[in-house]
Amino acid sequence: MDSDSERASLESIKDNSECVHVSNEPNLTATCVDSSVGEEGVTDVNSSAAVSELVPPEQGEGALLNSVPEISERGIPVDVVSSVDGGGEENAAFNIQEIDSVGGDAAAVEEVPLKSSSVVGEGREEEAGASIVKEEDFVAEANLSGDRLEENKEVSMEEEPSSHELSVCEVNGVDSLNDEENREVGEQIVCGSMGGEEIESDLESKKEKVDVIEEETTAQAASLVNAIEIPDDKEVACVAGFTEISSQDKGLDESGNGFLDEEPVKELQIGEGAKDLTDGDAKEGVDVTEDEMDIQVLKKSKEEEKVDSTTELEIETMRLEVHDVATEMSDKTVISSAVVTQFTGETSNDKETVMDDVKEDVDKDSEAGKSLDIHVPEATEEVDTDVNYGVGIEKEGDGVGGAEEAGQTVDLEEIREENQELSKELAQVDETKISEMSEVTETMIKDEDQEKDDNMTDLAEDVENHRDSSVADIEEGREDHEDMGVTETQKETVLGKVDRTKIAEVSEETDTRIEDEDQEKDDEMTDVAEDVKTHGDSSVADIEEGRESQEEMTETQEDSVMADEEPEEVEEENKSAGGKRKRGRNTKTVKGTGKKKEEDVCFMCFDGGDLVLCDRRGCTKAYHPSCVDRDEAFFQTKGKWNCGWHLCSKCEKTATYLCYTCMFSLCKGCAKDAVFFCIRGNKGLCETCMETVKLIERKQQEKEPAQLDFNDKTSWEYLFKDYWIDLKTQLSLSPEELDQAKRPLKGHETNASKQGTASETDYVTDGGSDSDSSPKKRKTRSRSKSGSAEKILSSGDKNLSDETMEWASKELLDLVVHMRRGDRSFLPMLEVQTLLLAYIKRYNLRDPRRKSQVICDSRLQNLFGKSHVGHFEMLNLLDSHFLKKEQNQADDIQGDIVDTEEPNHVDVDENLDHPVKSGKDKKRKTRKKNVRKGRQSNLDDFAAVDMHNINLIYLRRSLVEDLLEDSTAFEEKVASAFVRLRISGNQKQDLYRLVQVVGTSKAPEPYKVGKKTTDYVLEILNLDKTEVISIDIISNQDFTEDECKRLKQSIKCGLINRLTVGDIQEKAIALQEVRVKNLLEAEILRFSHLRDRASDMGRRKEYPYLLKLSNSLTMLTLRECVEKLQLLKSPEERQRRLEEIPEIHADPKMDPDCESEDEDEKEEKEKEKQLRPRSSSFNRRGRDPISPRKGGFSSNESWTGTSNYSNTSANRELSRSYSGRGSTGRGDYLGSSDDKVSDSMWTSAREREVQPSLGSEKPRSVSIPETPARSSRAIAPPELSPRIASEISMAPPAVVSQPVPKSNDSEKIWHYKDPSGKVQGPFSMAQLRKWNNTGYFPAKLEIWKANESPLDSVLLTDALAGLFQKQTQAVDNSYMKAQVAAFSGQSSQSEPNLGFAARIAPTTIEIPRNSQDTWSQGGSLPSPTPNQITTPTAKRRNFESRWSPTKPSPQSANQSMNYSVAQSGQSQTSRIDIPVVVNSAGALQPQTYPIPTPDPINVSVNHSATLHSPTPAGGKQSWGSMQTDHGGSNTPSSQNNSTSYGTPSPSVLPSQSQPGFPPSDSWKVAVPSQPNAQAQAQWGMNMVNNNQNSAQPQAPANQNSSWGQGTVNPNMGWVGPAQTGVNVNWGGSSVPSTVQGITHSGWVAPVQGQTQAYPNPGWGPTGHPQSQSQSQVQAQAGTTGSGWMQPGQGIQSGNSNQNWGTQNQTAIPSGGSGGNQAGYWGNQQQSQNGDSGYGWNRQSGGQQNNFKGQRVCKFFRENGHCRKGASCNYLHN
């Protein structure tokens, strides 16, 4: 390209002199050179970095300058001579002096004339003029965009990653259209060659552009954030990073008239580099990068120096021209300076202002100087190195240039000399500036902010990375940035870094706090759960309060995190939270809203510092985190935090009374027993604070200066006094108010002056809320004290001062002796406290940082057990060291906790693991009084069977495992001890029994027991038999009181030998070692857990815990936990317990000859209950320890060891379903002492109840034998129903031959023999009944009177039923003389074992008793077709499914509820006429019919006794005795509301072979004579086949005979005649049907003959059709098939629920509807009728002659249910 074309090119762009066309080629680094110029270079004398670079402009490369100021060389003056190859267009040399901007000097440009030198390029010489540009020239042309800086930097690094030498285009990322054109031709054009005549116009245009740039800078910067191309010069300037470009370096064109605008671009590049300060990765390795780049540039400079030399003439010419240009540009300097001021906030000419600002910034960031201290010496070394490099470059510049070098040697040498001079000057200036800077920097190091260090580091990196500008540009750009941009850039960078640092710190703190708070919340919730379990007696309100507190804490924590996320707001609050009384650092309120006026001192130590506020609304209290055992991270997490001032210091409930000056607070309940003085409302002073305040008010410290010095500013007392004075001023409290302070709820004796002297009140009693006690954790030792106790203590202690008896603990006495020089006499509490404070002051034990804390020396550490103790805590802990005080307390709770000196608490420690007793232990009080230190003398007395005694010889599995370690003594130690064995069953709760170990044996193979392996097995006495069990199945838990009581009953019954005091004591001593070890470990574990939990939750030492100690929940503080732990771990305590001889409780009542007063009292009460007309005592809870709900023993299991607990719940349900009016609806066990069998009982209330229902006095009829209670959960016995209107009347006296001998139940005349063969007794019948009902006797237990021999014994079941003769002679003896309400289902309270037989009148015949147990001795009851059970209760269904279909044998207790005649062996041949006539209305008419007698062997009803049946008009006839509840209740005790049919025996039933019934006669119920008849009568009285005539062979001894041949379905009523040959049984007959018409109905055994499975067939009368038809028992129209079916008509269909007594004309709801499928027996009401199936007894509807007047229960009528259930005497329909 020739000169014309070049000129034309320059002319074309002179209008926009600032336009710079930059090539973006990666390898092009020259500034605006001709594309054809490739050999011309630049001579560069080193800048502040002492760098002299001569960049060879090889094919696209131009001058590349390296001017990298280090951190320490900010503003170092640099003289630079630059010879720029502009394609022959310009040569420039500059000598610029730069002043450090950090030092505050305004950058100044020193104009140095340079020699004009010619630049050789492509064979032609071109002269260029260099102009010296002022620092401010180009400031206004650029506005740095923060976003663009990062982008520019990234572009720079991309385009020149290896050498970090970037062209202008690469640095700025310019991609304009001109740049693209230049890139295509491979040239870089510098625009701006203008003629000399255009300079003025250009200057004017520059000024205008400066103004425009000022306005458009912001918009341009924003628009260029995301743009890669820079379309015009203004955008280039913005990208370059200069705040203003005030001058240009105009190079001369060929004619010398034009100037090339090159400098703005270069300055822009510098500005960009300087502004790019926010990049974090530019902060490291700055020094290394500079060194590497300097080396690279120096190498290039050496080569360029040889090729590119200029003549001195050219340089001289340029110097003159530059001088002129500089003069012309001076006006622009002013404008640029103004612009600079806009961006930097300082004028470039005001150095002092810059220095002040810098120092002020440095003051704000004191850490910045630290890094400067590091970088300054390094930068100084690098500057020196750069100078040396520059010198070396000049020396080594020869040899480069090839053929063109020869013509320029002279010029290069001159330039080298100048460069050397400049280098020397620069070095000198550098040294001077460095020394000055070092001094300034040393001052700044202490206070300078981190922002400046980061900004200067970024500046150095940017200059280092972007040194592709000319030396002149670098000099001017550096000056501009030092004055204009450095400070601002540093501020921005450092602020950014500080913000990031703060954000990181806040985030880290927040995360830590959130984690801590989450853990804290988890711990607290876990503690709440544990507390709820441990402290079972806590009220629901307490739990709710805890839950609410937790929610409040959560909300507070959330607010806290929100506050932390706004550090500026918190900072503002911190500024406003200060107060005049801060003594520590400025208070920083971590929490709080600032809406309330917070206190500025800690409420616990009264000192200032970093405090946290309580978040409770209206609470102004502040605390040190350490005072509440929290760290600041805890308060930075989510949730609210309420201080412990708002919780009662004793029970942790919401506090009502608050102390003004300490954390002590009380709820209303605790305030009754505590000393608190209310001053205003519910706020006042605790006892401790009141005494301290009184000392302050009365100035008693002047009288006793050694005690409390409230004027010592270093003491805690001074802080307390200061706080009190301020508080009193704020509240305007007067001395009169203090004197009139009242105790809450006790207006008397609250005046402080009435409390007596200071010695009368304990300084720390309740008020020990102290500095270290946390919110909820105050010591509560004083809870059992009163004011009078305090006075007694104070006065009493004075009297004891001369005694030798120790009045305090050893540790406290040591301190007192030390301070009083050997005097051990008694001191009151306050004097001891004063002595302690004097000791602390004498030895200066106050913590200098926290005056409320005391540093414990060895003496205090022994006293308090810790290295630091709070003031209040210390005073409070003294309370535990006063022994006298504890002994004077009424309720010695502390003695239970620390029992070092009191041996009477031994068993308390031993029983710590035992469950809390449900009732009061009367013997426990005497146990404390009668402390025995040696062996007891009453070793032969009978020992009490109570929790304490049995605990001494009770072995848990863990104890047995410990005993296995000594195999030699294992058997000896475990023998005679008790273990707890689980009893299998279907109960929801497992049942356990205490059994005695009688020996050990070896197992065939070893097995695992815990962590041990053994082959030992235990031989235990399980009731009446010995069993072998493995150790691993015994319980590892403590036994319960109920289990202990059951054990006591077993011992009383003789199953286990009675224990004596000597036996238990000997065994307890043998087990003492292992028990003490186990108990100590358990106690240590428990107390350790309490201590750790309290520590984890930050609770203080005075926080009270509830702990189970023996039979009570005891408050235990954390402090006491620690003390207890120390005590338990001490060898002395262990040895003391080992040597202690346990105390054994004696119980004279365990003597068989001693009658229990309690039992007598109960019997008397029970007798009274029997006389009550309601006869509902059976509904009351029994008093026996064995309740059906707790599970007991069936009579069978008590002696056989087999458990039938699966029947208990079912029986309980059955008892409710089947029990009559007198039976319990709660499932109470039979035969609590409420049950009496005496005839007088039966007649007393029962007969009176019956009489109103009887139309006339008629002889009573047959009764049914009652059954002894199968278990304690058996169905309640039937009693006479008040609705007995239709009850069978008595038989004529002529028939009754043998009355029942009366017996007094309370008379002790009965003996029995236990399984060991030992005769026990005498006992009363009431005792025997109770034990039998609780299941301790076998079914065949025989008893005899004291005046008789064992040969005359009778079965207990018979005796309980009233049959005291072993054999009866007649039917009259076999059955009751009076008819029983059994058929009506009335259960008698006095007769627990009555089955269907209700109560007998005194003139009735005897009830034969069967020695067998109840229906199900083995837990299986007879099942009447269990597959068809439709009972509404699942329990009953389940229970019925257990009935055994096994064949009953005469010898086997007749478990099917059949009357077993095999036992009697006697033939009763009397005749019983049952006057049961069913009229057309279904009413019974008293008539008499002969009953043929079958085989006498079967002892059935063979006698033709005539029994009149009183059937009052309107009374519904109900076959009550036929009731067999589906649940198989053993005492059906069903209470049919309608009249019973008496006790019909099967022989009464009309059979085909028995034509003797009149047409109108219905079923005559014959009563079999069965001396051994089972107590539980079954449906048809389980008679033998009495309906057999001579033509019908009789079934042999069929106990299961039933009502004729009626087809049987358990859900049926009386049904029509069964088909012949059908064994109509309940569940089938056990005897094959040998004769047609004979129904061998039985409860259990399967029927060999096919039983008709009619829908709900009941007892169908079988007999001749004509006799059956005569039975007018048709149910009413509308009650299809209900009641007695007409014989001969077959099974009546249509009613699937035949009921027992729908014989009335009144329709009966339950059986009346043909669609009744409910299967209720005996007119049981369906649920829709209001009766949810209380049993068969419920006759629905009908005109029943109730003695209550047939009234309907008003509760049942109004509410649909009656709470009395079956015991109610009114109708429930």
Swiss-Prot record:
Zn finger intervals (PHD-type): 599-665
Gene that this sequence comes from: NERD
Name of the protein: Zinc finger CCCH domain-containing protein 19
Any Gene Ontology CC annotation: nucleus
Function: Plays a central role in integrating RNA silencing and chromatin signals in 21 nt siRNA-dependent DNA methylation on cytosine pathway leading to transcriptional gene silencing of specific sequences. Involved in a chromatin-based RNA silencing pathway that encompasses both post-transcriptional gene silencing (PTGS) (e.g. RDR1, RDR6 and AGO2) and transcriptional gene silencing (TGS) (e.g. siRNA-dependent DNA methylation and histone H3) components. Mediates siRNA accumulation at specific chromatin loci.
Zinc finger extent (C3H1-type): 1747-1773
Residues spanned by motif Nuclear localization signal 1: 581-588
Region (Disordered): 145-166, 270-290, 361-409, 434-591, 741-797, 903-935, 1139-1274, 1409-1469, 1485-1605, 1649-1746
Disruption-associated phenotype: Silencing-deficiency characterized by a lower siRNA accumulation and a transcriptional up-regulation of specific loci that correlates with a local loss of cytosine methylation on DNA and an increased methylation of histone H3 'Lys-4' (e.g. H3K4me2, H3K4me3) and 'Lys-36' (e.g. H3K36me3).
Source species, domain of life: Eukaryota
SUBUNIT field: Interacts with unmethylated histone H3 and AGO2. The interaction with AGO2 in required to direct DNA methylation and silencing.
Regions of compositional bias (Acidic residues) in chain numbering: 514-529, 551-572, 1153-1163
MF terms in GO: DNA binding; histone binding; RNA polymerase II C-terminal domain phosphoserine binding; zinc ion binding
Domain called GYF: residue spans: 1307-1361
Keyword annotations of the record: Coiled coil, DNA-binding, Metal-binding, Nucleus, Phosphoprotein, Repeat, RNA-mediated gene silencing, Transcription, Transcription regulation, Zinc, Zinc-finger
